[in-house]
Amino acid sequence: MWGGWEGHQPELFVEQVKNWLESEAIDYVISNDLNDYANFEFLSKFNLIIQSVTMSQLTNEQEFGLLKAISGGIGIAGAHGGLADSFRNKTNYQFMIGGQWVEHPGKIKKFKVNFLEDELTEGLEDFEIETEQYYMHYDPNIEIIATTKSV
C-alpha cells in the first residue's frame, strides 16, 4: 500500500520493494487505494502488508479492516513515516503499530544507526547516514532493536 505525502517518495519506495519481491519470486499486489483496507476478504489473501503511506486519513471502516487483518495474523511492515506517521487521527492504528512520529529534532544531520543484538538484526552492520531523525512516542512494551545517535 502506498500513498500520502509525496515528500517521502512513496512511489519510489514501492518500486524498490517491488524489485526486491520480484528478485525473490514473491507474488504481490500493489495498491494506492486505502479502500482496500476496508475489504477484509481482500486483505485475508495476504501474509504481509508492506505500507508506505505518510500523513493520510483512514475512514473508520478502513481502520477496522486493517486492524482486523493484522489481529488475524497478517503481518505489517514499512519504513520511516510510511508506517510511523501514516494516520495521525487514528489512535487504534498507532497502538497497533506501537508508536507515532512526533518531531524531527535538529532537522537534517549526520547520525549513526546502531543495531542491537537480535535475530532480526543478524548480519546487519551499524552505519552512518545524513537525514532527519525521528522522535517517537512508543509503547514501552516493544523491543527496540536499532537506535540513532548524532555523530
Give, region by region, the residue ranges found by the protein language model.
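Short, well-ordered alpha-helix to beta-strand connector turns
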Residues: 45-47, 97, 142
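Helical hinge/lid and interdomain linker segments adjacent to catalytic or ligand-binding clefts
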Residues: 5-84
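Aromatic side chains
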Residues: 28, 46, 93, 134-135
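Catalytic beta-strand/loop cores that center a nucleophilic Ser/Cys/Thr
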Residues: 22, 104-151
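Short, Lys/Arg-enriched charge-dense amphipathic segments
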Residues: 32-35, 48-60, 86-89, 101-106, ...
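Short linear motifs at secondary-structure transitions and domain/linker junctions
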Residues: 4-6, 23-27, 52, 87-90, ...
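A glycine-rich, often tryptophan-bearing local segment used as a flexible ligand/cofactor-contacting loop or short
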Residues: 56-123
